[in-house]
Design a protein with these regions (language model features):
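Active-site metal-binding motif and surrounding structural segment of the metallo-beta-lactamase
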Residues: 80, 91-138
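Conserved beta-strand hairpin/beta-sheet module of binuclear metal-dependent hydrolase folds
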Residues: 40-104, 195-198, 202-206, 296
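Metallo-beta-lactamase
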Residues: 35, 42-45, 138-272
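Short, glycine/acidic-enriched loop or turn micro-motifs at the edges of active sites
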Residues: 89-90, 119, 211, 269
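N-terminal amphipathic/basic-hydrophobic helices that include classical n-h-c signal peptides
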Residues: 1-20
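Active-site neighborhood of phospho(di)ester-bond hydrolases with catalytic His/Asp-centered motifs
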Residues: 85-87, 109-117, 137-140, 204-208, ...
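Acidic/His-rich, metal-assisted hydrolase cores and their charged scaffolds
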Residues: 21-37, 106, 241-245, 249-298
């Protein structure tokens, strides 16, 4: 059950020509202007991540600037059936699919769980369905509607609500049963958002919630001080305006049996200090819902 970790790197020069991609260890990665890379890691039983690292992105949407780039994280869960959680930004099409095809046969993918449909997480859905039109897209009612409007091709779908389950069955090698429970989390930060909790690994997949715009080859939250300000700034910009929705989501999370890892859609996965980060969301949201004023500077 050891971790597997490697990255694929591609460097886009100023003239936008592309240097040949190659598999390399993280220690060999050299930061250059406009660099994109992909990191793969097994982080729990039958569960792995493909992290698309956008090292030099300087602005996200129109809300705020970025000082440390960002990542777009997607996930693979292999039970008896195979599920992908989220895809990536369209700019990562080549790198993301190269990595995905190393790990799985697209014809064996049964489900694509869509946490929410902002293009940085859903940008490759149409491409994936082209590889395998039999994939069942799982999401909230709004998410499925948004996907229809985005890709303009027919697809199989499964609408889910809070408290419903999707049983992927037991992995034939590990014996771990991956039963996915869905948690509605509207307005975090889009109205279509759902969380996915794997009862087999105690991993909660939250997409934007609990994330941060921080690009690093550190896979987990190994240095609390290093990422704290970016975590707080991200909360203030994206989650703070919907503080009451955050508190409602946390109430639902607190009913889960155990929380070992929060697999976020941006930045490092929260594993070493899960309770600390969750408590900060609760503290900040409680203050905002009471009308307490504060200013975040990052």
């Amino acid at each position: 059950r050891g971790f597997i970790l490697y990255t694929t790197k591609v460097i886009i020069q100023k003239n936008h020509s592309m240097i040949t991609s190659a598999k390399t260890s993280t220690s060999e990665m050299i930061k250059v202007e406009q660099k994109l890379s992909v990191q793969y890691k097994i982080f729990a039983d039958d569960s792995s991540a493909i992290r698309s690292l956008d090292w030099d992105r300087s602005r996200f949407d129109i809300e705020f600037g970025l000082r440390n780039g960002t990542t777009y994280n997607s996930f693979i869960i292999k039970g008896q059936k195979l599920a992908i959680i989220d895809t990536s930004h369209a700019k990562f099409e080549k790198l993301w699919f190269e990595q995905l095809l190393r790990e799985v046969n697209p014809e064996e993918i049964d489900y694509l769980i869509t946490s929410h449909t902002e293009p940085d997480h859903s940008g490759l859905i149409g491409n994936l369905l082209t590889l395998n039109p039999q994939i069942i897209v799982v999401g909230s009612k709004l998410a499925l509607k948004f996907i229809e409007d985005q890709i303009h091709i027919p697809f199989k779908s499964l609408e889910v609500k809070s408290g419903q389950y999707l049983d992927l069955g037991a992995n034939p090698t590990s014996g771990v049963n991956h039963n996915i429970e869905f948690i509605s989390a509207p307005n975090l930060h889009w109205p279509d958002t759902i969380f996915s909790y794997d009862h087999g690994t105690n991993v909660l997949y939250t997409c934007d919630a609990f994330g941060l715009h921080y690009c690093s080859d550190e896979f987990f939250d190994n240095d609390q001080k290093e990422i704290y300000e970016d975590f707080r700034f991200y909360y203030d910009c994206l989650m703070g305006p919907n503080a009451r929705s955050v508190l409602q989501a946390i109430k639902r999370i607190d009913k889960l049996p155990r929380l070992k890892t929060i697999a976020v859609g941006h930045g490092p996965l929260l594993h070493n200090q899960v309770n600390f980060w969750k408590e900060k969301y609760s503290e900040w949201s409680s203050n905002k819902s009471k009308g307490n004023e504060f200013v975040s500077v990052c």
